[in-house]
């Protein structure tokens, strides 16, 4: 299976290997994700429910898409902000982070490698769903694993559609 994944990642640029921020090379705690937004949508909604398309049950398909579309948009919004933050001069690294148990996940860990500053962001479609105390707990879990990233000037915050 490794050869096929390598071709899809390196030759076709169809998928991307995503590892938690600051994981050591060779870690097995990585995920492969479809890198193209169109193909992510296609495989998540159209291909998965192709039987509805073939039966011309478009109303049912639309209902299923609407039910899960916010989750799809959430991952797309994370991708947008990761790209946008790296285009600016503030950060040289931006990645997701999660622990092995899956209990803690931080949407964006952004670092400026020149200054050493590390900021943590939660990405939400609906800003009302942001819980700063919950994010602080996740950041503490991150800092227990990576104590060298602890800084007084680190920022914890929210990125939402309003920040686009």
For each of these PLM feature ranges, what is it?
Residues 1-16:
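Short amphipathic alpha-helical interaction segments
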Residues 7, 21-164:
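A cross-kingdom feature that marks ATP-driven nucleic-acid transaction machinery
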């Amino acid at each position: 299976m490794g050869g096929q994944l390598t071709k899809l990642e390196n030759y076709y640029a169809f998928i991307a290997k995503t590892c938690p921020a600051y994981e050591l090379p060779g870690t097995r705690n990585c995920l492969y994700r479809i890198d193209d937004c169109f193909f992510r949508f296609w495989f998540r909604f159209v291909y998965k429910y192709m039987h509805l398309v073939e039966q011309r049950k478009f109303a049912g398909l639309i209902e299923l898409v609407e039910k899960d579309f916010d989750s799809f948009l959430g991952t797309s919004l994370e991708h947008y902000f990761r790209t946008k933050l790296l285009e600016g001069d503030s950060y040289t690294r931006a990645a997701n982070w999660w622990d092995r148990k899956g209990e803690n996940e931080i949407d964006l860990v952004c670092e400026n490698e020149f200054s050493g500053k590390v900021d943590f962001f939660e990405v939400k479609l609906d800003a009302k769903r942001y819980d700063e105390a919950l994010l602080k707990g996740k950041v503490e879990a991150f800092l227990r694993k990576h104590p060298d990233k602890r800084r007084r000037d680190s920022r914890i915050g929210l990125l939402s559609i309003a920040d686009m």
